[in-house]
Design a protein with these regions (language model features):
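Membrane-embedded and interfacial regions of multi-pass energy-transducing membrane proteins
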Residues: 2-589
Length: 589
């Protein structure tokens, strides 16, 4: 750690602030750190660890579905518990934490030209509350009866009733408590991201000079700050129903002929609260992915992003529209047909700004000097996958088509393509792209290409056949389907094939983790800007960046984030902090 003093040219106020927030002991530097970069690594490591738990749970589910009756320890109750924990971990504790807590913490201060987040101490607390939420969630595996088996959507009354897989006394209480903690921690971090983007930008960094990665993370954070309160309220009310006997979501109901001590609640109210959060959550994950892909494509195609302002407004438009489509998840809940028509219409409208982004990505690639690096391969794979998943979403957004497909494997396939495979491809692409900045070394190229092809092709061999199973009427949420009147013999064989592919893709991730760890010491030295990128994170005086990011002087921004192939320039890129004019400006007006 380099000691920083006023003699180095940094204003005394900034030195005092940095010393206050970042003491030099090992314990406070690497464990209770207030450096956003260290916190980002902590978020990413924790999310990866809990993500591996979700991967193992998916393997257990696929064992049961692919080879029913073979593994006696996978009981129906255990199967539903696996579904619940796998879904909740992947959506909330892995993807949200990775994109916002991981990439958001590392990239926002560097990309906007700040020394750190505006509130470093609050940022540190947000991570430790997230870690506590993860530990509370994992503890439910060791609670009496195990974790809740209510499904990752936690629908009442099953989630509340005692004696059901969903209503395990401690399982559901720990799940709800964990979600409440997660939302508290995220709110602390999210406010930090928003304030840093709005108030922490360096001189010359206007909003329309921000990289699209920052726009994606910023918009997703604002959405989360608006959507998570609905889930928070739903969790608190359900916790009261389960622990205190209230009736927010429990209707008058009889269990085995005995009237339960609840009455007057509405399970549909919970669905509205959950999906008011749940559908924006799709784009809370997707919008950072959109921004990252835009930066990857522009950098590795050596071409300015096409339609920057359109891309920004498309991100904002998607974020706004995502709050008026939630009830398309509830077509089979008894909704009035007129409401179904309204939500089907808004669902189709949201495809317009999404299509703008796809067309602009394609036009950015058009006649570009495309370098098929590993980050670029993952970015291209994301575009293909998201388009495929979006096309099936057009089917499910239509009431007439959704009703017969709602409880089939078609929905599972669509959801995993859009919410699982596509974002994970971006996560991998981003790691391969920014790993040199974080560690100063490159990941192994051969292992990286093997990882890409095994993941990309394997994911399609898992989820494409699943669409076919859904069209055959194979239901989801069943732990065992052996009756040939429900599933044909060919469908059973297909299920077994999907399970085998799930294991192959899972083991490919072990190769990736090995590459990640091995390259820290043995990877090729990357230099300061191996991709010859224009954005500020690549212009730091040290790699990896020291605390304070930019040494004694913060950068001054003179241009937008995508000056590639500029006539008259010495190289095919001009960093944002380089002054001067080279030919006609391509910066958006």
């Amino acid at each position: 750690m380099v000691d920083i003093t006023p003699a180095d040219g940094i204003p005394p106020a900034e030195v005092a602030e940095m010393e206050l927030y970042h003491p030099h002991s090992w314990w406070t530097k690497y464990v209770f750190s207030q450096d956003a970069k260290v916190i980002a690594i902590q978020y990413s490591a924790t999310a990866t660890g809990i993500g591996l738990v979700a991967l193992v749970l998916s393997w257990l589910m696929r064992l049961q579905l692919g080879f029913p009756g073979t593994f006696d320890f996978i009981t129906p109750e255990a199967y539903y518990q696996f579904i619940t924990m796998h879904g909740m971990i992947m959506v909330i504790y892995l993807l949200t934490a990775l994109f916002l807590g991981g990439f958001g913490n590392y990239l926002i201060p560097l990309m906007v030209g700040a020394r750190d987040m505006v509130f470093p101490y609050v940022n540190m607390l947000s991570y430790w509350i997230y870690l506590l939420a993860v530990l509370v969630l994992v503890s439910s595996f060791f609670a009496p009866g195990g974790p809740t088996g209510a499904g990752w959507t936690l629908y009442p009354p099953q989630a509340i009733m005692s004696g059901t897989p969903g209503g395990q006394d401690w399982g559901i209480i720990l799940m709800l408590s964990s979600l409440i903690l997660f939302i508290i921690g995220f709110t602390m971090g999210g406010l930090n991201y928003v304030v840093t983007v709005l108030q922490g930008r360096t001189r010359g960094m206007t909003l329309m000079r921000l990289p699209l990665t920052v726009w994606g993370i910023f918009t997703a954070t604002v959405m989360a700050l608006l959507a998570f309160p609905a889930l928070f309220v739903a969790c608190v009310m359900m916790l009261f129903d389960r622990a205190l006997g209230t009736s927010f979501f429990m209707p008058a109901i009889s269990e085995m002929g005995e009237q339960l001590q609840h009455g007057g609640g509405s399970p549909i109210l919970f669905q509205h609260l959950f999906w008011f959060f749940g559908h924006p959550e799709v784009y809370i994950v997707a919008l950072p992915a959109f921004g990252i892909v835009s930066d990857l494509i522009s950098t590795h195609a050596r071409k300015n992003i096409f339609g920057y302002r359109m891309m920004v407004w498309a991100i904002v438009g998607i974020g706004a529209l995502s709050f008026v489509v939630w009830a398309h998840h509830m077509y089979v809940s008894g909704m009035h047909p007129y409401f179904g028509f309204f939500f089907a219409t808004t669902t189709l409208i949201i495809a317009i700004p999404t299509a703008i982004k796809v067309y602009n990505w394609v036009l950015t690639l058009w006649r570009g000097d495309i370098h098929l690096t590993i980050p670029m391969l993952f970015a291209l794979a994301f575009i293909v996958t998201f388009v495929n998943g979006g096309l099936t979403g057009l089917f499910l957004g239509n009431v007439v088509v959704d009703v017969p497909l709602s409880d089939t494997m078609f929905v599972v396939a669509h959801f995993h393509m859009v919410m699982g495979v596509a974002p994970i491809l971006v996560v991998f692409g981003a790691i391969y792209h920014w790993y040199p900045k974080v560690t100063g070394r490159m990941l192994n190229e051969t292992l990286g290409r093997f990882h890409f092809w095994a993941t990309f092709l394997g994911a399609y061999l898992i989820f494409f056949p699943m669409h076919y199973l859904g069209l055959m009427g194979v239901p989801r949420r069943y732990n065992e389907l052996t009756d040939m009147t429900v599933m044909t013999e060919s469908a059973h064989h297909l299920n077994s094939f999907i399970s085998i592919m799930a294991f192959i893709v899972g083991f490919a991730q072990i190769v990736f983790l090995f590459n990640l760890i091995w390259s820290i010491r043995h990877g090729r030295e990357a230099g300061g800007n191996p991709w010859r990128a224009t954005t500020l994170e690549w212009q730091t005086p040290q790699t990896p960046p020291a605390h304070g990011n930019f040494g004694k002087d913060l950068p001054i921004v003179y241009r937008w984030a995508y000056d590639y192939s500029v006539p008259g320039a010495k190289e095919d890129f001009i960093p944002q902090n380089v002054p001067g004019s080279f030919g006609p400006s391509k910066e958006p007006a």
